């Protein structure tokens, strides 16, 4: 069907019973110690404890504009622990300089989940522009676990050890880096109701990384790099497109990703920029006949430009643009082979400008323009959301209050009050449309103590 027109972003088409409540407690610490003048050791660690409770009812829009929905309730608890440590040593062998780094990391995750759905046939909610409120239906059609006491549904242990040496030639004008990294990913998934093990794997791999930097002058550098990494397999959703997935919660096999980049960097002190071409691949998943499975990979090849700095005193610029060729490759039976993956624009760009008003010391005005190209909403590439452009304006004033630096800010986002679909996403087959924010005015103040 056709993409529905975006509704008035200042309105609210959500059902009155819906809510999302999330709490996160996290902390991190890191320290370094110079063992000698050329050897440094470091260690860091952190944790995150999260709790989440949702009662959702996202509308589905038909070709005639009518909307329907079903109710989805879930609770989630996450516990994450991480630690990393390493050594960095610098020395020379003849005319060649070395910077050797060895490091190790470990990340442990335990996730508890429970969910419940109402009848997937759904209920009428009017239209996006004229929503109709309904009484919350019972969530007894598809249940996984106890919402008040969710069981462990996923555990993951990611460990890695890496060593790399950056060699310096020609008085530091040529830098060459070579490294190896061993990764081990151990993941298990469990049934949300019974707690029984449903799938998992324990896989390890050594992957390489290489890089070159040539400092053509004090301002211009040419660089190139290649790296591989082991990525965790995707987890099958429990529901996709309003239909239960028969292997929901199953974890797919890990994927070896590759990244290649070649670029040029200019740094003139006050002003600079980079221009690069790159190629990155990532796994692709598909839901077909209610089964989630791996379906080849997404190949992203593109050109990226970024600029930064103060080309004129009092006038600053920060921006960038990316042109992306995204294609699905190695798909099952050639389905959607060569198509663009869901929610991937061919062009994205933004530019931020700031100007210090000389007549009023401390006063700065700024503007930002953001543009995103069209995005397909289905893997067959038959329908897409239109491209969009947003203008933001702001002003800030820096002053001192009792010798304390204070900055006052005012900002107007989406100056033209455009209604637009900002992005497309979700699990395969879900095809979520994300509505952009309406015109929004904000005030803030900050102080440095």
What is the role of each PLM region?
Residues 1-34, 47-78, 122-150, 158:
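Acidic/polar loop-and-plug regions of large Gram-negative outer-membrane beta-barrel proteins
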Residues 272, 277-281, 293-379, 446-448:
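Gram-negative outer-membrane beta-barrel transporters
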Residues 100, 224, 260, 342-449:
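Conserved C-terminal beta-signal and adjacent last beta-strands/turns
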Residues 38-41, 95, 172-176, 219-222, ...:
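Repeated loop/turn-to-beta-strand initiation elements of outer-membrane beta-barrel proteins
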Residues 33, 89-91, 166-169, 204, ...:
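Residue-level signature of outer-membrane beta-barrel architecture
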Residues 43-49, 102-108, 178-182, 222-228, ...:
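Transmembrane beta-barrel strands of outer-membrane/channel proteins
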